[in-house]
């Protein structure tokens, strides 16, 4: 009985031998008997993906069921280690979805447990596997940290070299590529400094290295220690004082204040705007004031003061750059005049020193002497409390025309302005005066008051103005010739001009009688320090130059 069963079993076992069969032979073999073999083989090689191409159809779930388990384990067990380019996707059952990103980001064994990276990175795909060693089970390395072995690469891609301080892979137990820790430490330890020795490139050539503490060598596990100069940190560099910059050469001449800017450039224009008042200074020596001031005030500047103080005063006044510059006057006079911001008669500090400047200027030019002798300018007593009369604002384009109006006792406005003034003069007749409050555009002050003495003669052209476009003329008599800053009159507002200040008026803007009384009172009582008389000689010279140019133009036109 027993012998027969043994022979029967031996005969059946010999007939059913298979190469990879089970250890215990049975009479019948079922499909379920192979599952332990497949499952065991799957567990051993679970981390070895056979995905050489990341774009295979494994992304899509299988549409039919399979009698065997689906996984990525290699079918061959010939003994060669698999080449895991991608991580495993885990056990795939029928109907489950398989996504590529599961292998690329964050899965156990994804990019971290595998020695070689997949083709998404730039490292080569065919490294020499002999350089990795054979210790440890392939694909079953433990991950030391979440980021410990990311971005690793085989040493063969470096030409068979290792990084300073990194032994061979056969002793690496942290599942990291050779030289990873040393490379990270080398990047952290980058310093600024010169390295006296040189680093050896993988091809054997010698190049000088700067700011490297660990370098690559040609030996598999040798270390190259580079003597580095004394380390210098960024903080030490930032703490060093900046190198002193060479000082720019200053112009020769009187010493000015520390950071005073140069005086503004004055452009020479024949029309005589506010930017071109006063003697034209020479370009090479803009700082020397005696030469420009010699024309309007030759004796005034030379006698009381030396030659250099005017040059000192000019930058001191121009450095604050007060809003619109007035006509060109002596800088000390202008500073004294517009430095006062109080009410009328508040120039307690300036009259004793500066106010007499207008008197000595009488000797500057004979024409001015005749005018002062024929007219009593700036009377001490003036009837400003008018019972009847009309007052108008006159805006001039240049102070040259103011000079000629005082010289010839005439004036001319625009065509519209002439009609308005002529109508007012004829309307008042002998009932009251018609006063004109003169101001130059952009000057920042009123320069005087004149009374209209005749109706407008539309058919006559004076031919003395800085521009030839004005037609008609009428006689005027100048009463006040003084510079009154706008801040003395800005509080007076005109109800017939949108309640704007009187200083913000157009040409031939009429001032209501009650407001006109206030303006006349302030102008008459204001103790001025400057006036156009200070530069009268300068405007005389400009007029002579214009006459020469006009005659030359006329002679060319005749030819």
UniProtKB/Swiss-Prot annotation:
Question: Which intervals carry biased composition (Low complexity)?
Answer: 296-320
Q: Which Gene3D superfamilies match?
A: ph1033 like domains
Effect ascribed to mutating residue 411 to A? Abolished binding to N6-methyladenosine (m6A)-containing RNAs
Q: Which GO terms describe its biological process?
A: immune system process; learning; memory; mRNA destabilization; organelle assembly; positive regulation of translation; positive regulation of translational initiation; regulation of antigen processing and presentation
Compartmental location: Cytoplasm; Cytoplasm, P-body; Cytoplasm, Stress granule
Name the source's superkingdom.
Eukaryota
Q: Where is the composition biased (Pro residues)?
A: 281-295
Q: Where is the composition biased (Basic and acidic residues)?
A: 24-33
The family database entries (InterPro entries) matched by this protein are listed as: YTH_domain, YTH_prot
Instruction: Give the record's keywords alphabetically.
Output: Acetylation, Cytoplasm, Immunity, Phosphoprotein, RNA-binding, Ubl conjugation
Q: Which GO terms describe its cellular component?
A: cytoplasm; cytoplasmic stress granule; P-body
Modification after translation: Ubiquitinated by the CUL7-FBXW8 E3 ligase complex leading to degradation. Deubiquitinated and stabilized by USP5 by removing 'Lys-11'-linked polyubiquitination.
List the molecular function annotations (GO) for this entry. mRNA binding; N6-methyladenosine-containing RNA reader activity; ribosome binding; RNA binding
Binding, RNA: 395-397, 401, 411-412, 441, 465, 470
- The record places domain YTH at 389-523
Residue spans of biased composition, Polar residues class: 346-361
Q: Does the keyword RNA-binding apply?
A: yes
Role summary? Specifically recognizes and binds N6-methyladenosine (m6A)-containing mRNAs, and regulates their stability. M6A is a modification present at internal sites of mRNAs and some non-coding RNAs and plays a role in mRNA stability and processing. Acts as a regulator of mRNA stability by promoting degradation of m6A-containing mRNAs via interaction with the CCR4-NOT complex. The YTHDF paralogs (YTHDF1, YTHDF2 and YTHDF3) shares m6A-containing mRNAs targets and act redundantly to mediate mRNA degradation and cellular differentiation.
Subunit info here reads: Interacts with CNOT1; promoting recruitment of the CCR4-NOT complex. Interacts with ribosomes. Interacts with eIF3 (EIF3A or EIF3B). Interacts with YTHDF3.
Family of the protein in this entry: Belongs to the YTHDF family. YTHDF1 subfamily.
What's noted about domains in the record? The disordered regions have the ability to interact with each other and to 'phase separate' into liquid droplets within the cytosol following binding to mRNAs containing multiple m6A-modified residues. This leads to the partition of m6A-containing mRNAs into membraneless compartments, where mRNAs may be stored, degraded or used to transport mRNAs to dendritic arbors in neurons.
Q: What is this protein called?
A: YTH domain-containing family protein 1
What organism is recorded for this protein?
Answer: Homo sapiens
Give the classification, highest ranks. Eukaryota, Metazoa, Chordata, Craniata, Vertebrata
